Amino acid sequence: MLKFIRGKGQQPTAERQRLQKDLFAYRKTAQHGFPHKPSALAYDPVAKLMAIGTQTGAIKVFGQPGVELYAQHTLVNNSAAELNVQLLEWVYGTGRILSLTAANQLILWEPVGTTLVPIKTLPFDGKLKKVSSLCCSLNKDLLWIGTEGGNIYQLDLKSFTIREPVIYHDVVLEQVPPTYKLNPGAIESIRQLPNSLNKLLIAYNRGLCVLWDMQTSAVERAYIAPGHGQSVGLSVNSTGTEFSWYHADGSYATWSIDNGEPPQNVNYVPYGPDPCKSINRLYKGQRGTNDVIVFSGGMPRSAYGDHNCVSVHVSDGHKVCLDFTSKVIDFFVTYKEGSDDVEVLIVLLEEELCAYDLTDPSILSIKAPYLHSVHASAVTCNYLASQVTQGVYERILRAGDEQDIDYSSIDWPITGGVLTDDSVESDEDEVVKDYEILLTGHEDGSVKFWDCTGVLLKPIYNFKTASIFGNEHEYREDGAADISAEQLDEGEPPFRKAGLFDPYSDDPRLAVKKIAFCPKTGQLVVGGTAGQIVIADFDTAAEDQSSLKYNSMNLVSDRDGFVWKGHDQLNVRANLLEDNAVPLTENGVNITGVLQVLPPASITCMALEANWGLVSGGTAHGLVLFDFKNFVPVFHRCTLNPNDLTGAGEQLSRRKSFKKSLRESFRKLRKGRSTRNNPTNQVPTTLEARPVERQIEARCTDDGLGSMVRCLLFAKTYVTNVNITSPTLWSATNASTVSVFLLHLPPAQTAATTVPPASGNVPPQASRRISAQLAKEIQLKHRAPVVGISIFDQTGSPVDQFNAGENGSPPHRLLIASEEQFKVFSLPQLKPINKYKLTANEGARIRRIHFGSFSCRISPELLQSLHSGSPTKSVRSHGEGDGAGNVSATSAAGRGDLYHEMALICLTNMGDIMVLSVPELKRQLNAAAVRREDINGISSLCFTNDGEALYMMSSSELQRIALSTSKVVQPTGIVEVEPLESEDNETASLVNDGNESDKDGEANKELANTASDTQPPVATLRAKPLELNADRSSLHLTNGISNSNSPNRANETITSSIGDITVDSVRDHLNTTTTTLCSTTTEETVGRLSVLSTQTNQATTTVNMKDIPDINIPNLMDLASKSNTTETSTSSVVIKSVITSISHEKTNGESENVTTKTTAHEESQF
């Protein structure tokens, strides 16, 4: 039975474990894109902040570009529907925000770092107390809560309790004119007059509005709008002299606050006289001398009731109805300071965020700096281009600027928050740098370029392929239809198409399946669903530009009996292929040509080598190799077997036949007898025992085609002999067949490997064509689909990531990653070196692989111990590149040497990300990154060269994660919090509770003085662990206090450490204080701690959690907040596990070294 015991193998050394912690760390950093299922919107005109709530309980706060804060509600009754954020209300100018959930729970949030922390919670019970509206006082001390029962409660924001008086609806009814005899219904809107803060405008559901005087607790004036059905809301002007009242029948009117009589246009319906839908939100302002009314809804119910519109009506007669393709959630209008002059309209839709310039009569669109809709058309593939050169990046920007000429140049109005000095300095220092560009392929045939180098995901270019295909007549008709649809008849609502979200695609064959992009030359290749490969580049200044070229390659033309039963190929427009046609250069991109692969099956993989002018594409039927410089085919190979061609045979099966299974059973019986009879065959020892492996189930016959090409790779490596590198193309299929093709390049392409071409379309000087031949073929025995191939050099760097002319340091090694295992081979012998069976050991399957670069600063002592390590590790300074013999000991400003290491990153079908060393394939990190149920997130994940990853956490959002400690991109902006007045008392109580257990008078005075001087908010005190520096080293205390103040002159060092801090432990210890035991020359083992602080030598030491190192700060964002922890005014201690090591060195001339470990457990309540 010992052979079934897993062998532990060789364990990493202590130095290696230290280095692993310095190199690898998993954390979720930033979120890009548009929030999934938004449900609420709020704007703070004082702090210039915007907040969005979602149906999943998320809250996102945005200020100036770079300021982003995230929060997440927690389950109350284990019902996800209760997480829906229904209302958001800012406490103006303080940075705090209130949220109301579907569970009728009111929560006060406060920004701490880059997160929002819930500090107060108030639940409401009963149907009559169902909250319908919120209004925060301009004095920042009260919140008025309107309910569906018609009552208004006052919430004291300092104590977060309901206080008197309550404005009951029956009290209000007693003071309104007797002509109003209805039950007023729910509170629809509450507004405080800006010129008279003791007066409230209250709008009830059934056509009643009152002006309430809070000093006298009486109705000062009543406004009755009969005949309009339900009221919806109010909008008060900046001077507090008039208000706009809008209703559910599509009407609105402007009332004077000093006059209760209805205005003359009280029956005005903008889109009447037909019955109209409700106006959901309305703002009124001015543009010069003209009044501007902005409202959502109000469409004629029968004709245009299904339109999602926001209308802008100006008193000079100009009207625009912005017609969106998704539901309008909410919107707001920004004004100039202290006036009613409108500036910007910001509309939150179900699928996107749109902004418009209201100062311009043409109401131009504004390009927002964030919250872009990644899924304007459904995303079909992702490609992440790392280390894009600045020259290529600038060319993409110039092309994108040509597309942005129709946008307004007005400044973005949301400018709240403060950017830290680090983020500002880094932007100024890095003048020349590499960029990270995310390319998303879409269902409509477009490819969008996103700059994801920093926290902001900025759209920089949109490449469209749909205009190439189709006939000319259809294309012209579509263009005419788009122009005519801009405006309808004058008698109808003046519709204008608005927004970018377009979920519909004219032709599913246009969908982009694979993308290849060269970060050094800017060459772009796009593969589609119908076997089309579009070749383009960003060099529009080339002199030899010609008309669009077209070519096709048939994979099964020489095979008899094959019948393609799928969709037809796309037709290139005939006018583009004429000899006198102008070059297809649009918006800064030159489209060179189109390659059509036949049969027109979907492109399953692509590889691009711009220096050689080659592109290779794979389908379910085989692969093609194409020379796009000369635009001629080079090579094609069909991977189908005869059974697949005729359809008579089944797909490749991994099930054993009955004859083979019976034969193996008899062999096992014979082998078992011989083993029992042979005493020399002993059971291996524990160290030699093989690990227990899961049985790999045979794949069923309905698996994917074994002929499908899964991955392609261009590499210049050692194939024929050990001394000379040769250009090669590697391919792999679903049936574990790896083929190596030797490429014969003419002199021009060979020279291009040493000198990069100036553009992607420079034709070769020689007339000799490129040729390819099959050199080697590898058949893996387990026959699992191959998901990735990579060739790396001695330092572990992939050779395909090198610049032109660099081959890497020999020897080269080949990594083949199938769904079940990794295998490393030597080159050119192709001898197995190492392997890692993931499915057998872990039960997971490999989905994606990538090589990443990891680096950190290390001490010279650690450097010496690493000199004898793996050859794939190196130590280098800032100015050195990747290569062999690149080991140096250059120290930068005394911070240590820059240690560099290449590693293999792997994503599994369980959503886990593993980091493995190469070529040893030893696991360095394993993190659960994506939920295993999130199939879309797992399939969309892509890695960068610096150990980062992006995946789609929803159909519209991207989550960024970091695996390296040296490259972490996360929001650095903060929101300054204005302290509440009542926090002085709470802070004093915190200090007093600490003084009760402290007998050192001087220390007490220092604590009290510090607290009284700073007066920090309670939430800031409670969340101080969030302000940790993840790179801080361990803190060493001498006798628990500083060296200079130590009363004990003996040379004793006490180091206190706490075990692994997890999210669960920190959740229970948000306000934990750890107490260190102080000792002199006598020690004893302490079984438990019965007091909150221990005194020795008349000195008590308290260490806050900020002194505890190695806390993963971004993981604290996922903490489930406890409402009861925010209600207490004392600081309690909870110690789970404290390990105290006391080390005695030479004392009083005696040489002695004694170590005592004390483990203490204590539990207390908050």
From Swiss-Prot:
GO BP, sorted A to Z: cortical actin cytoskeleton organization; establishment of spindle orientation; exocytosis; Golgi to plasma membrane transport; regulation of establishment or maintenance of cell polarity; regulation of Notch signaling pathway
Tissue specificity remark: Expressed in the epithelial cells of the digestive tract and in gonads, in the ovary's nurse and oocyte's follicle cells.
Annotated Gene Ontology cellular component terms: cortical actin cytoskeleton; extracellular region; plasma membrane
UniProt-annotated location(s): Cell membrane; Secreted, Extracellular space, Extracellular matrix
Main location class: membrane
PTM characteristics: Phosphorylated by aPKC which restricts l(2)gl activity to the oocyte posterior and is required for oocyte polarity formation.
Highest taxon above the source species: Eukaryota
Region (Disordered) residue spans: 867-888, 975-1002, 1144-1166
UniProt keyword list: Cell cycle, Cell membrane, Exocytosis, Extracellular matrix, Membrane, Repeat, Secreted, Tumor suppressor, WD repeat
Residue ranges of WD repeats: 39-72, 82-128, 131-167, 189-223, 231-263, 278-320, 328-358, 380-464, 513-595, 604-665, 709-779, 788-833, 838-928, 942-965
Annotated transmembrane regions: none
Single GO MF annotation: myosin II binding
Reported consequences of knocking out the gene: Malignant transformation of the optic centers of the larval brain and the imaginal disks.
Matching PANTHER family: LETHAL 2 GIANT LARVAE PROTEIN (PTHR10241), LETHAL(2) GIANT LARVAE PROTEIN (PTHR10241:SF29)
Physiological role: Essential for the development of polarized epithelia, for cell polarity associated with asymmetric cell division of neuroblasts during development, and for oocyte polarity formation. Promotes the formation of actin-rich projections at the oocyte cortex and the posterior enrichment of par-1 which is required for oocyte polarization. Regulates the localization of axis-specifying morphogens such as stau and grk. Could act as a tumor suppressor.
Family stated for the protein in its record: Belongs to the WD repeat L(2)GL family.
Complex and partners: May form multimeric complexes. Interacts with mahj. Interacts with aPKC; the interaction results in phosphorylation of l(2)gl. Interacts with ball.
Protein name, per record: Lethal(2) giant larvae protein
Lineage of the organism: Eukaryota, Metazoa, Ecdysozoa, Arthropoda, Hexapoda
Gene: l(2)gl
